[in-house]
Amino acid sequence: MFRYELIGTDGGARRGVFHTPRGPVRTPGFMPVGTLGTVKGLTIDQVAATGADMILGNTYHLRLRPGHETVAALGGLHKMCGWDGPILTDSGGFQVFSLGAINKVNEHAATFRSHIDGAKIELTPEHSIEIQQALGSDVAMVLDHVIALPAPMTQVEDALARSIRWAARCRIAADREDQALFAIVQGGLDRTLRQQCASELAAMSFEGYAVGGLSVGEPPEDMYTTTGFTTPHLPADKPRYLMGVGTPRDLLENIARGIDLFDCVMPTRNGRNALAFTDEGPLKLRNAVHKLDTRPLMEDCPCLACRHSRGYLRHLFVAGEMLGPILLSHHNLMYYGRLMQATRDAIEAGEFEAFKNAKLAGWGHEPFQETV
């Protein structure tokens, strides 16, 4: 029912298709984040127009609002939000990290205080799977223990061991044949721990494998290095997903190291704050230099924003018009979607390295090389 088809490789980069009951997911691919069943500011049709094959929903937030039972009563996440393609739901594990001041973690569960009303919520691996099954996502994630980096080795080892045990509990609890389950590799920035975790999780036969616990405070170069020594220990016949990443540079550097799937709020969050991604690098449209600029953000971009001038887009933000965040969110997701399509084409043509280096140069970056 779920199958990863590897079409070709170019160096470490992989071109493939993740086949799901609701349609194929082309890889490398980027998943727009619809935390509460909506990609902020955009309609489902607008999201689809950016080239996305799969979107992401958030288990923790949907558990609180409107509640997973409510989502199920409304026909599941797909019917509720109107998305016909595949949906991936995260497990709530990242909230253990991001809302750490109001959470506690022990072997049994992560205990939350709702950021909405302060209600106590106990999230066990089994309850995380129960919620994701009620939501009806196509891909569920195991519950893991995320920590900030850098961290003491004892803390990294403890979170790693707990994540492996929780993954095993999720594997037992996940009994829907129409829902894939992805494991999450932890281990901080330590090569030995990452490889140990990858090997132990690979033995549990998940439908896909995520690299988690990165983009949590470490320098980008440490992320790239860690991805590079982790992916060789993951099954080649399963999709590889780097969670919560990232900038256009992050995407290309990690694709070079064997990653297939990404998600991040960066395109839409930055779009709501007047920052547009382009081949010239990011443009901050509130800057006065754009006031009289008649050019579009990009000449060849088919998004809604690029029908207008940079000066008009700046005006929308300065005036506080809601159209500004909508247009830039659409542009940024379109930019990410087109970047992924161009990347897939470059891999198939055997030109990925040259493509990556040209893009990085346009953004003002040098290719990253690990030190031996």
UniProtKB/Swiss-Prot annotation:
Its EC number is 2.4.2.29. Substrate binds at D90, S91, G92, G93, F94, D144, Q186, G213. Its cofactor is Zn(2+). Signal peptide: none annotated. It comes from the Bacteria. GO terms for biological process: queuosine biosynthetic process; tRNA wobble guanine modification; tRNA-guanine transglycosylation. Pathway: tRNA modification; tRNA-queuosine biosynthesis. It holds the Pfam family TGT. Residues 244-250, 268-272 are annotated as: RNA binding. The active site is at D90 (proton acceptor), D263 (nucleophile). One of its GO terms (cellular component) is cytosol. Gene3D superfamilies: Queuine tRNA-ribosyltransferase-like. Zn(2+) binds at C301, C303, C306, H331. Belongs to the queuine tRNA-ribosyltransferase family. Homodimer. Within each dimer, one monomer is responsible for RNA recognition and catalysis, while the other monomer binds to the replacement base PreQ1. This is Queuine tRNA-ribosyltransferase.
